[in-house]
């Protein structure tokens, strides 16, 4: 009698012990499937791919959905990184699933925020909070079912480096001082808010999907810091960075035309953490200003479409230089 039989565990005649991994409702629970958990799927991350996968969705619909999600985050004093995680989950889910119903988008994006809050917040959102902002049209079971659907689609890869992650890393390198604590933020909070407002606005545009997150973060910095210094810090060559910087210029001009707003105060949040809370400007109005101020020259029009050839070059460069980027940031 084999050792497994002596221990009272049947191998089912296959010579292998039974799996004690939880059943997630999948049709298959092969070892290959389990090995892929926590790893990102290979997919084309672009505006064209998303709109092909979701033909019923327009670029403006995506902007409205994410802008509304910012408002939800502000209502519950949710951190900006939590929003950016939710945005990443939402976009990846739309890229992976085909032809989703528009009526399900609110449930999907709220569930993405629910998952993100569990990853990032010390006090995660409750389903009842999300049900309230959705006017109670979704049951608790619907949120739980959707949570499982999204997690399975993403293969539980729910700790990606977001555009905000890259931005904060670059800022830390940029403002680092000798003998300073690397865990403390050294950059001025008011400048940080202006920088993140530009990133917020750009991420609402579906064309932001055509540029890697670190490229977006570096391009945002170029509008506040000398571009040569940004290139030195990020390691991204000018010929790959410049198209995204040009594409982003009308967003920066629109924000300047819109003007700044006083920093919002959240009574439940510590003073030193106030600037990390996701807030919402009237971004849809700013996007309209951005459209009206965008140059119509051929070069600007190509940048406005985030010329896929150029951004594909940036994506390819990223794949081969990822280790170099991290070395530069150390």
Regions inferred by a protein language model and the residue ranges of each:
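Acidic, serine/threonine-rich low-complexity regulatory regions at protein termini
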Residues: 1-110, 114-330
């Amino acid at each position: 009698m084999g050792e497994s039989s002596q221990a009272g565990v049947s191998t089912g005649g296959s010579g292998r012990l039974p799996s004690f991994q939880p059943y997630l409702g999948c049709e298959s629970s092969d070892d290959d499937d389990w090995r892929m958990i926590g790893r990102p799927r290979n997919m084309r991350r672009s505006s064209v791919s998303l709109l092909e996968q979701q033909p019923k969705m327009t670029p403006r619909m995506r902007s409205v959905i994410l802008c509304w999600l910012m408002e939800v985050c502000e209502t519950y004093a949710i951190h900006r990184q939590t929003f950016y995680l939710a945005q990443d989950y939402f976009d990846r889910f739309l890229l992976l699933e085909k032809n989703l119903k528009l009526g399900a988008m609110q449930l999907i994006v709220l569930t993405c925020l629910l998952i993100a809050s569990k990853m990032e917040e010390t006090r995660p959102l409750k389903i009842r909070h999300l049900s309230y902002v959705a006017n109670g049209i979704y049951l608790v079971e619907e949120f739980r079912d959707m949570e499982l659907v999204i997690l399975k689609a993403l293969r539980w890869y729910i700790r990606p480096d977001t555009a905000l992650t890259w931005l904060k890393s670059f800022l830390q390198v940029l403002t680092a001082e000798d003998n300073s604590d690397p865990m403390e933020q050294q950059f001025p909070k008011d400048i940080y808010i202006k920088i993140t407002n530009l990133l917020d606005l750009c991420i609402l545009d579906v064309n932001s999907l055509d540029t890697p997150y670190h490229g977006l973060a570096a391009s945002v910095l170029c509008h506040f810091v000398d571009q040569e210094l940004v290139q030195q810090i990020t390691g991204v060559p000018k010929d790959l960075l410049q198209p995204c910087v040009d594409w982003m210029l009308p967003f920066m001009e629109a924000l300047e035309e819109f003007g700044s707003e006083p920093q919002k105060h959240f009574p439940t949040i510590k003073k030193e953490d106030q600037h990390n809370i996701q807030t919402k400007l009237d971004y849809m109005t700013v996007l309209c200003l951005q459209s009206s101020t965008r140059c119509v020259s051929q070069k600007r029009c190509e940048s406005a479409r985030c010329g896929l050839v150029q951004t594909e070059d940036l994506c390819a460069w990223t794949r081969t230089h990822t280790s170099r980027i991290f070395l530069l940031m150390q």
